[in-house]
């Protein structure tokens, strides 16, 4: 979280994705009140907030009111401010992860209810990894280990044993041939990737 970039190249030292300098109070941390958001029409959060129905705005305000008050009362600086910003960012990130998890559960329950769970290929993946405080960074712009590691979970009982893992390197271009293979369709010879 407090990497000083000693011995790292220029790109790492001059990057624009540090929790300390780049994580914004408005867009990233949602530290604006309703009045502040609606007053500044140049703020990119304004257009998102303005499109929300009033009842959703009320929920938004309620969800972030304590954070805003805590921030304004705290007068944090240096490492204390970095730590606080990191905690708020992770709180939002983990809330997103929880929402994804809950909705995957809803999907699995529905597929089971209609009798299609074991006949459905379920894939959980992402386009890239993400910095969650490593090196003092957030976001996903550098070719470091954290950004190269992507989740790839496939559930398909007809072809994959539950709980199995693989150390094989895979890429997004492998998805199409894999799905064609699962479906019993011949993979064209000119397609990129491998099943």
Question: Which positions does each model-derived feature cover?
Answer:
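Active-site-proximal cap/lid insertion segments
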Residues: 1-170, 182-190
């Amino acid at each position: 979280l407090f990497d000083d970039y000693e011995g790292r190249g220029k790109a790492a030292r001059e990057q624009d994705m540090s929790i300390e300098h780049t994580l914004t109070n408005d867009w990233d941390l949602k530290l604006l009140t309703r009045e502040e958001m609606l007053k500044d029409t140049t703020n990119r959060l304004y257009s998102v907030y303005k499109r929300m129905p009033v009842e959703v705005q009320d929920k938004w305000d309620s969800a972030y009111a304590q954070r805003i008050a805590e921030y304004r009362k705290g007068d944090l600086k240096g490492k204390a401010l970095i730590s606080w910003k990191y905690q708020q960012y992770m709180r939002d990130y983990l809330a997103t992860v929880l929402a994804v998890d809950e909705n995957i559960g809803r999907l699995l329950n529905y597929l089971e209810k209609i009798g299609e769970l074991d006949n459905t290929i379920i894939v959980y993946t992402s386009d890239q990894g993400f910095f969650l405080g490593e090196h003092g960074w957030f976001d996903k712009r550098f070719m470091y280990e954290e950004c190269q590691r992507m989740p790839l979970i496939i559930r398909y009982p007809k072809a994959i044993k539950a709980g199995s893992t693989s150390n094989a390197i895979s890429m997004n271009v492998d998805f199409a041939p894999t799905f064609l293979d699962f479906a019993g369709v011949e993979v064209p010879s000119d397609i990129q990737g491998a099943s």
